[in-house]
């Protein structure tokens, strides 16, 4: 059994999905060393990530970059000599995680305690104490499980889950009744994972027809609001895009009937809250939704059209493998899942 950890860090990209995986890794450390000081380092969007993890009092979120030297000094003060530091795997095949992050992780970790993942960087062999192979046929969460095993830390949590600060005022604010609405989240962080605006509208209309007695609640960011209004035009959907905080969204998801989403952070929040989820993904997002990610019994229906990209992903403004998904079938599944 690994010795108790006094302090540990993980470096992550500043997205909801990546930070959820970082929290899962740290949560397993916390289960084995509850007194440990644990930090998740991001380059930006720390306010959003703190909101995401407001229910985790033991988790420190640190935003560190070259524009925030004070944060770098704070990391040195609080986490120098860490018993374990884990950096993130590369976001795409042939890529590599930030070299500057790797260098700073090396400075913070005790000798023998820096774990990373194989990627395209030629510097890895000089920096890391242990490198974990990344397999494209494995679920994303399996990378973090492999890092825990490499560190000798027992995996206490078989699958990622999420806690939130319960507050039913979100239901009252948006005039919703628990169990009588569906969250519809059709906006990814970039168009390369999303649906064309016309397809968004087709899906909202199909959902409205298939679920006439269920309120549709269209979520998204502030920049998505105008498109959300266009997608829902002529329906009775409630538009909350740009109005709900992450904690409010978690409360709404927890009290919803179902979530319909493209492959983005909100879908993973729903999956980790164990809510019935209908998710549409691209061919390159497959590893995020393999059964090892959330378990064979997770209430998740996955829609994809990988066959369209059989010869390789067709990168377009809006991906062909998303455009080919049958939105009528998605709407039908939202009724029955």
Which residue ranges define each predicted feature?
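Catalytic machinery of carbohydrate-active enzymes
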Residues: 1-337
